């Protein structure tokens, strides 16, 4: 029998994969999210949290409210048990590790605009291919990540291409760059480097470029 009460909970969307903002559950618990902010969240398809909850059959009759969060001192300790994701412990032959903090996490949402034409008669010299520009950007992101290996990581894990037909030159390609680092300064350097590189696609490929959203959650080191 434990000497003190123990509560077990699961937090939601801590990396912002759905709502584009991180620490969704954690911010709820600590009162660092207002009701208005909660209701303003949209996923990449434009759906808000209440829409998604209803689709999943969750919290239909629950009134949302977290302006005050849990009272300070309500819990004396908080422990998060997390599965090993990167394979570092396994490679080192260790069973468990203790993290020293949370890395800074940033995202750039980028649209490349080209001109959709038929893939057959449109000669290469006049093409404005949004996918080619996006592919170039993705390779640059890979190179920047490799150059900062051990200190930062870069990933493009989402691509939306239009019209996405095999015999049509892409007219619009949207991607999301995810970048992370233990150093805020390095994360900012990567962000600025990739923004400049994105805009350089205009002259290189004759495409339009728009960065529609920038998100960054700073590094948090534990005491």
Each model region followed by its residue ranges:
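Active/binding-pocket-proximal capping segment
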Residues: 38, 193-194, 215
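A structural signal for isolated positions on well-ordered beta-strands in alpha/beta enzyme cores
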Residues: 7-9, 210
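Short beta-strand elements
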Residues: 150-156, 205-212
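Midchain, well-structured core segments that form catalytic/ion-binding scaffolds
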Residues: 13-184, 199
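Short amphipathic alpha-helices in soluble, non-transmembrane regions
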Residues: 189-199
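An extended, acidic, His-containing surface patch that forms the Zn2+-binding/catalytic region
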Residues: 210-223
């Amino acid at each position: 029998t434990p000497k003190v009460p123990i509560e077990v909970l699961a937090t939601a969307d801590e990396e912002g994969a759905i709502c584009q903002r991180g620490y969704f559950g954690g911010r709820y618990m600590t009162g660092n999210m207002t009701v208005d902010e909660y209701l303003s969240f949209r996923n990449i398809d434009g759906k808000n949290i209440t829409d998604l909850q209803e689709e999943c059959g969750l919290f239909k009759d629950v009134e949302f409210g977290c302006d005050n969060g849990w009272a300070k001192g309500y819990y004396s300790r908080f422990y998060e048990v997390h599965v090993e994701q990167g394979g570092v412990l396994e490679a080192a032959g260790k069973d468990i590790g203790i993290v020293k903090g949370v890395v800074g996490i940033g995202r750039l949402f980028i649209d490349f605009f080209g001109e959709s034409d038929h893939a057959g008669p449109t000669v290469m010299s006049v093409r404005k291919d949004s996918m080619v520009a996006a592919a170039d950007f993705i390779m640059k992101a890979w190179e920047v990540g490799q150059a900062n290996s051990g200190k930062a990581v870069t990933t493009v894990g989402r691509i939306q291409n239009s019209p996405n037909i095999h015999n049509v030159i892409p007219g619009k390609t949207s991607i999301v760059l995810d970048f992370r680092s233990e150093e805020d300064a390095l994360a900012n350097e990567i962000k600025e480097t990739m923004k400049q590189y994105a805009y350089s696609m205009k002259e290189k490929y004759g495409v339009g470029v728009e960065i529609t959203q920038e998100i960054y959650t700073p590094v948090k080191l534990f005491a």
